[in-house]
Structures are given as C-alpha cells and as structure tokens.
Amino acid sequence: MTQKTLSHNTLSPTEVVQPLLSVIGADLQTPLVTGGTLRYANLDYAASAPALAAVADRVAEVLPYYASVHRGAGYASQVSTALLERSRATVGNFVGARAGDVVVFTRNTTDALNLLAGCLPEWGDVVFLDVEHHANLLPWQRGPHRCVAAASTIEATLTALEDALRDKAAVLVAITGASNVTGEELPVDRVVALAHRYGARVVVDAAQLAPHRRIDLVASGADYVAFSGHKTYAPYGAGVLVGRRDWLDRGTPYLAGGGAVRRVEVDRVEWACAPARHEAGTPNVLGAAALAAACETLRALPEAALEVHEAALRERLVDGLTGIDGVQVHRIFADAPSSIAVVTFTVENVDAGLVAAYLSAEHGIGVRDGQFCAHPLLARLGLSAGAVRASVGVGTRSDDVDRLVTAVRRLVETGPEWTYASVEGRWTPTPDPRPLPSWAGDVAGLAGTSPCIQTGPETHR
C-alpha cells in the first residue's frame, strides 16, 4: 500500500499487451444481436474477476478431499482442516499480517466490514470520506460516525481529515485503498499516520486494491484490511478480514452458532476467541482454498508486473476514450499520484445503461453501468444518472481495450445498429435474439435489474 513510481520495465500504451495470467473464460464466445459471435471482451473486472486457471486447478485438486473440518476423525476431514488453516496463513502472508493478527474468513468485503462494525469500542466515532463504496459507509452509519467531504485534491482532503480527527475523538478511520469508481489510489500510509496520531485505528477497504497492488500491514501500519475473493480471481464465495486481535476477541460474535463457542448451556454461552468467534457454522473451505491459491499466484508475480501491465492498458484506454468527441473520463482528485486500471466515463447525450447494452449486444464487450454502489460519490461528480465503468485485470489484452474504444467511437459517430428499450430500469435490445445456455434459465432482459434503478420506459434506435 505504498506509492511508487515505475521507472523500468514499462510498456508503451501503443504496444501489444498480452494477458499476464491465464483466466477461465478467456476464449468465451458471446453471441451478438446482429448475428455471429465474438470472443468476450471482459472489461468488468472491478465488479467480479474471472477465476485464475491456477485457482480452478487448485479447487479441482482439493475437491475430492472436501469434508467437514475441525472435529472430524476421518482422513478427508483432517485434510480439509489442514487446508483451511494453511489457507488462513497464506492469506495472512499475502497482506503482510503481523504475528498477532487474526485472519477471519467471511463471504466478501461487505461481510468483513460489517463484522468489524460489531466489534468496535464505544468511546469514539467512525470517520470516513464521502467517496466510499456503500460497503465502507453503511456499516458505520449504525453507530456514532462522521463523514468528511473529500476535497478536489488529496492534500486538501488529508487536511480536512486531520481537522476532523483533531476536532473530536475517533475510534476508527475507514478508508478505501482505491476507488471502485475512478481507480484513484488513496495514500493509505499517510492516512494511517494521521489516524494513529489522534488515537484512531484504520481499516482499509481493499476490495479494489488487493487484486492490483501489494498490501503490507506491517509497512503501512494499517490495523485492519478487508477484501473479497470474487474480485481477487477466486470467485468461490470467500472474503476476509485481517487485523488486530483485541477488538475481534471482545466483539459481538458475528453469527451465533456452532463452532463459535467454547461452552453452551441452555441459558448462557461462553464464546470462543477469534477467528472461530466470528466463523460460526460450516466454513467455506473451498472458498478459502481458492482465495489462498489466488493470493499465492499473485504474490509469485514479479514485483512490478501488475502495475506495468495495468499502466499500459489504462493509458491506452484513457487516451482512446478522451480522443472521442463527447466522451468524458471522470476522476475525483486533481493530484492522485496513481490509479488502478478502473476507468469511468460518460458519453454526451447517451444514457450510460444504453452505452453498456450496446457494447454487449453489438460488440461482445462487458462493462458496468450505473452508480457502482457509490451514490454519494456519483452525486458529487454530477453523475447521479449513472456512468459507464471499464476495468481490466490480469487476463486483459490490448485488443479488448481497442475494441471498446472503437465501439464507443462508432456509437458517437453513427449510433447503434439495433433498437433498444428501457425495461424495468435496464436498457435491453428489442428484440434480443441472443440465446442463453439452457442451464442459465430464461431471464433475458432482466439480468441487470437493480432496486436502485428507477426509470420509466424508453426506446432508442
């Protein structure tokens, strides 16, 4: 989580960029409304990343041994127990955990941050910025909290944060490592130094940071970090919270149930210490093993490999989009020193949902549209109506980026070939002849519906 400048082994944004690692679905063929198929260009890594081939291989390898853990005498149970605890150690090593830190497996980042919210001391506020994903905003609203408005520069934002910490005691500062909307990295090390100066701890929402940058709790001094397997090339249902033991040992158990206790009577319970205290029920052993395999694979890459690969693709994408009339790429800060490869843009006079539907239906490109579970940030950017987000990862190649830029340029210059209508808040091709696999069910046109999208019927050609 340290800022650094790439001074060697860089790629030119005009060079052909190949995938850094093998991912499942890299050669997936997607049908087009205009007929035929194209290789799916997955530019939606920030939402959920595909499984690394190495992760899928690991899951297939351990699956025959799957069994209930911790108290089974059978051989498979002993293997599964050893696998779970080895996975715990691997994930801790991935984030540079301190010797006394606890690794708690959860469902995802949202789950992990809600868990921590139930373990906070009651003597101070939680402080966060208005640029956070809802997962790092809503859990803190249940208790004493303060929101600091981010300024137009990181320097001014740090000043505002220090003013808030000086003004009133805070128990925790909750900060994102990298914006899920713009990709801009926040200076975690400096935030930690500020928070500790005023007696507050820091939790880092690393959902976006973990797949793209090295994390080191010892070096940064951050107290807690949370991230998800499904964004870190291990979409098997596991997430994690890693951090200091004392709050987790004293906090309210996240779920009440078997495995989280030392002793139970009909009217009282003695809870176990963390991590068991917060892992009631049968754990997701395969999810933990998958997350550990992803961590091992990413950690084995050369130090700057991720940054070099992403920097070339991001620059290629931003340069291409900003070269199209009527297209604007959005950012929060004027002085962000670095960004992960997440780019949010709008097309003048074209609804973001229509842009995304067009890219999918006519060009086989997957992007995200909407408000990205960050309503306050989209509002401050003037994008309450939504935007389009393109994001890359280890399986992305330069051809994916080039296809997106070409498709957006064609949309601006000539418009879509097909007719589209807004159905229950989502733009969809009308008609939509693309078949779904038989095992997927018949939900064509409704797969993108969301409770936070409320728009009336519209048609566009």
Q: Each predicted region: which residue ranges?
A:
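Pyridoxal 5′-phosphate
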Residues: 1-461
